[in-house]
């Protein structure tokens, strides 16, 4: 079973970093130096959780939620993830799923339910959070410095790419002079897909 089971999933493109390449760690290092807020979700802990409710608590803790965690955390995690008003995101924000491929290794989750659950967190960051922070004080559109990605081992890279049905973008490098810029491969892929949708709608 692949990721794209819902019509709304079509607008999501997974951004993948190969752990052994060291690209992600170097990029995160430079972004931290530039004042970016980095949130890393430990997918091995997600894998070892009892399910999405306990996993949601892990995410609430990772995003430094300052209030009492809701009684039904799985019902609320996306709503708070698209907000994050208690964090300083003024310089930029990077949301990372660490060791994402761990979610494909559980014998108790043959349909990769938790892999999709975790990837949907990235969807919320990409769409809802990015939109919320993409309006300036005059209400004009001003794209926010918001990035997301998942870290995957070389060993399980093909498995993850197959799960995302060829729509994932593997990041080979980044501009060290502008580490917060979206990678040209990601931008090109988005532009091509959006253009194809316009063509199909004619």
Segments (PLM) and residue ranges:
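Positively charged, polar, low-complexity stretches
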Residues: 2-202
């Amino acid at each position: 079973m692949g990721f794209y089971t819902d019509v709304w999933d079509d607008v999501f493109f997974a951004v993948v970093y190969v752990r052994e390449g060291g690209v992600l760690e170097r990029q995160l290092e430079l972004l931290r130096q530039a004042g970016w807020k980095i949130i890393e979700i430990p997918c091995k802990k997600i894998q070892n959780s009892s399910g999405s409710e306990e996993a949601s608590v892990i995410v609430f803790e990772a995003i430094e939620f300052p209030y009492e965690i809701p009684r039904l955390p799985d019902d609320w995690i996306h709503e708070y993830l698209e907000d994050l008003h208690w964090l300083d995101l003024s310089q930029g924000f990077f949301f990372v799923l660490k060791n994402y491929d761990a979610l494909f290794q559980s014998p108790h989750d043959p349909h990769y339910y938790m892999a999709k659950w975790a990837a949907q967190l990235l969807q919320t960051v990409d769409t809802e959070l990015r939109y919320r922070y993409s309006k300036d004080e005059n209400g004009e559109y001003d794209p926010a410095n918001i990035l997301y990605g998942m870290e995957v081992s070389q060993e399980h890279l093909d498995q993850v790419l197959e799960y995302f049905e060829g729509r994932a973008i593997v990041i080979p490098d980044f501009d060290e002079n502008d580490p917060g810029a979206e990678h040209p491969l990601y931008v090109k892929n988005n532009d091509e897909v959006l253009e194809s949708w316009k063509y199909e709608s004619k």
